[in-house]
Amino acid sequence: MKSTFALLLVLFLFISVSAVQNAPAQARTDVYHVHFAKAALGKGAEEGDYLKKQGPNAAMPGHYIVLRHQDGEDWDYAVIEHLGTKATVDAAGNPASAAARALSAWHADTFVSGPAWPEFAHAMGLDDTAKSAGSVYVVSVYRAAPGHREELDKSLSQAPGTGDTVAGSVVMPHVEGGPWTFLSVTRYNSWQDFATGEKASVADTLKPDGGWLGVRNHATYHNDTITDRIAP
């Protein structure tokens, strides 16, 4: 009887692990607005304070994240805002005040598709902002090589390996806007976890179609920026 129970337990664990490993990728049912902003000279702090406040006409109040550049690309802030399952653009737009415009040197806007808000919020640590306050985020954009979009998507969407320190991640395909195909945001619980993950990933540099090699097999361009979160 004990041996039968042990066998069933092992079988259950095997099925459970297989189910996790073969879990489908996040369903991309919703639209998000991605805003990269470079502060005007001497206005870095003020630009951050401005971007932390979601607009009064937000489609989904409270559904956003603001990340601040620490190392990487030229932009200073990235704002990712959830718009729901559909998004519209009016001719009048949402013009910023003259004071707000004076804070920005340049900005770039792109619409992407992504998971429903609860999935996105969980991956980014927004379902418990106090607990995730020390998180580190790596924001990356990729331009797929011609005919390699699906392969790049698959490579970027691979589940973290055993012992990986990634706390959450999303891969969001371009819908309209910037000259890239995918945006990925990867979250680590701390700077220590980020450093540990970076060190461990070196051993997987030449892993077939994953990490370092996968990007170079399927993308013609990419950049990575390390950030921290300033809102919410």
Predicted regions and their residues:
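N-terminal secretory signal peptides that target proteins for export/translocation
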Residues: 1-2
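Short S/T/G/P-rich N-terminal loop/turn motif that feeds into the first structured element of a domain
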Residues: 21-232
